[in-house]
Amino acid sequence: PFIYIKAYSFDIDERGMEKSYENMKDAYISTFDDIGLDYRIVKADAGNIGGDVSEEFHIIADSGEDLLAISDASDFAANVEVLEYEKDPSELDGQPSPDGKGKLIIKRGIEVGHIFQLGQKYSEKMSVSIKDSSGKGIDSFMGCYGIGVSRIVAAAIEQNHDDKGIIWPYAIAPFHVNVICLDPKKEEVLKECESVYQIIKDAGHDVPVSYTHLRAHETVSD
């Protein structure tokens, strides 16, 4: 299933909205950094949601649906949809970066997050107000923040796999330890495996136990 989580912020003025926006942006950055993904924050089209500021978080992947224009000499990055070029997006590779620094590199990305500064667009229509220090109601300045949880997992797999399967990033690995009991018919082996399992469990970790008669390297690969 596609799992997408949304959050909203409500502030009394534009400065507060901008601060909330930056706080949420930092939280997203921290999340993707902890997972260890290769990602970019890009300028984006606000679309039907609207707002003056809109940015997307994209995991770099050849299978991505979106085309991203990234400067090779600065932090500039944007979804090609917002670039004012007459050229076809596929022809933008090597063109001068809009910020005047370096040239554009075109990459594909998987969108896993989208954040907006909405201003008072919705609060005015829905009468969502906040009282100031004098008790006067002010239409709140809103921010909107979405993150695709299931897409993060899919993108992480896209960036971390080999011909034998998934190489889970530590931060989102289902388990950090797996006890493999080779030749469990031997009582001393089984006893030792159960002892190791209990030690790890007592330390507060979830740990699966695999009982197998395969050779060690075959079991680890599996």
What name fits each language-model region?
Residues 204-214:
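Conserved BB-loop
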Residues 213-222:
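Single conserved hydrophobic/aromatic residue that forms the stacking wall/gate
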Residues 1-206:
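TRNA-recognition modules of translation machinery and tRNA-sensing kinases, especially anticodon-binding
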